[in-house]
Amino acid sequence: MLQLNYIRENKEEVLKRLAIKSFKDAETIIDKVIELDNSRRATQKDGDAIKAEANAIAKQIGELMKAGKKEAAEIQKAKTAELKLREKNLDEALKGIEEDIKNLLLQVPNTPSAKVPLGKTPEDNELVFEHGTKPTLAQGSVPHWDLTTKYNLIDFELGVKLTGAGFPVYKGKGARLQRALINYFLDKATEAGYMEVQPPIMVNEDSAYATGQLPDKEGQMYHMTVDDLYLIPTAEVPITNIYRDVILKESDLPIKNCGYTPCFRREAGSYGKDVRGLNRLHQFDKIEIVQITHPDKSYEALEQMKDYVAGILKELELPFRVLKLCGGDMSFASALTYDLEVWSAAQQRWLEVSSVSNFETFQTNRLKCRFKGADGKTQLAHSLNGSALALPRIVASLLENNQTPEGIKIPKVLVPYTGFEIIN
């Protein structure tokens, strides 16, 4: 959530940055926010004046009582009662105005960084670099959904029977490959200085609002209405919320956490070839990395996180590319995002496997996650997160790119985790 003072002091800049994200109602909402804030300030000023007057009268009453002037004191007490009623009404009005401001601010996306490329569609994203050689597959090579059936790795139909489409059942070496990737990704993260946490996979409404999933992605989340809980779309939500309503020491920064969780997304409106097999699921496994940093260090941390994920893809020997997302392709909460995509040899297209983002103070303002500097003053920290990595499309590309007439070869770095070198 954008900070109210920042909006007041930088209205034109805020509108300019929001236009990069193609936020249509920006001017209407921002003008209304400023109008309400003016009302808030006026109401607050009136309330403070009444409190000051009531305090002065209370002092007078004490002096009158000491002087034995009870009748005059009673007159002043009547004034005090009237002032308290006015104060109560102003407090209620103030709460209503503040709630209206909050509800409007919740609709406003984060302002993109000045480093964000201009554009409205994925075609406008900026290519940062591409790594690796796209493999040339032997004749008769097939996409991963055929490979998983051929080698009895994943049963999509059984998942439909048990739950529905988008909930695959991993079996045999398919399940072992899944577990191997999870352990490998977690080991890499802890080696890089991230503390592993195992958070809940359901969160309350406050947590979903704090990281920006609500109200932006309400239709994409599974909502457990009986208990009013949400299945998490990413471990970012519970891990980042560890620091909700927390004041850190500057020496605590940066905080680096990682965690593995199943993730759940409704993916409403997704159809066609792009959702076949592992390309888009309702339940999938992912390792997330999260950092809470000093504002001066967050973009340095973003580059480190992007390079860290790229390093894993290099070890997996997967051709990949890094994109800097344009304003129109960015998420609601992000200030700057890198997407990392791997090459799918059988599908002949790029598959997104990671998004690494800096949210600056957008999440921490909602979280009320602050730190106290050496001067004793508190300020909002910056938050960042990234997928490191999401498993489904990694598995898809590993199976497709490494298929041979003899079977599917396992990357060397994974063999100690899988216990086998080939799937045949």
Language model regions located:
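N-terminal alpha-helical targeting/anchoring segments
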Residues: 1-135, 149, 153, 157
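TRNA-recognition modules of translation machinery and tRNA-sensing kinases, especially anticodon-binding
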Residues: 130-424
